[in-house]
A protein has these predicted regions:
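Short sequence/structural segments immediately N-terminal
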Residues: 2-205
Length: 205
């Protein structure tokens, strides 16, 4: 009899738990789910920041990545390599999220096959390059400055021409991309456009 009463009491508690226990349980479950979600979200974010992810589609691997492999950003005497995300993904969280949202448009064009052949890519190269240059100009070449900084430069260790250009650029308030277009990827064809209007008068790519 006592056992039956005990079972009924337990059943009632399960059917109508105390508000105190309900709130505590919900908070615990919410916390655990939040930790799992945040962990999964950050894992996914980091996975999309790997160079292997960037070149997982052939448009990147077969075109711009092959160009990049021939540049000083890929192989140099110091062994320091700037990978795709180093140059194209901000490190600060807010700006990184904004860039990830923008990337959804690139996924759409991947599906549409906008640049899925060399011919299509070359036809769009100038537009794509200008989009990147405009963005870098707007952010004062923020990603370049993760590795390069005027204040940290030892002008005495640079060649005379580099000292002159960097000094003039610093005095004129120029940013990296003003002079260094085409340093990591081939420049677009400028046959039908004014080169100075696209590259700027001071471009030293």
């Amino acid at each position: 009899m006592a056992d039956e009463a005990e079972k009924k009491g337990l059943w009632q508690k399960l059917r109508r738990p105390s508000t105190k226990y309900t709130l505590g349980g919900l908070l615990t479950i919410g916390f655990v789910l939040g930790v799992l979600f945040w962990g999964g979200f950050n894992t996914a974010m980091e996975a999309t920041n790997e160079e292997s992810f960037c070149i997982s589609c052939h448009e990147m691997k077969d075109y711009v990545y092959q160009e990049y492999k021939q540049t000083v950003h890929y192989s140099n005497r110091t062994g320091v390599r700037a990978t795709c995300p180093d140059c194209h993904v901000p490190k600060e969280w807010t700006h990184k999220m904004m860039r990830k949202i923008q990337a959804s448009n690139e996924v759409l064009h991947k599906i549409l096959g906008t640049i899925n052949t060399p011919e299509k890519f070359e036809a769009k190269r100038l537009q794509l390059a200008q989009n990147v240059w405009r963005s870098m100009k707007k952010t004062d070449s923020r990603e370049c400055r993760n590795c390069h900084d005027f204040e940290s430069m030892d002008f005495g260790a640079q060649q005379r021409r580099a000292v002159k250009q960097h000094s003039e650029g610093l005095d004129a308030g120029k940013t990296c991309i003003d002079c260094h277009k085409g340093i990591a990827h081939s420049l677009p064809s400028l046959v039908d456009v004014d080169p100075s209007a696209v590259l700027g008068d001071g471009s030293k790519h």
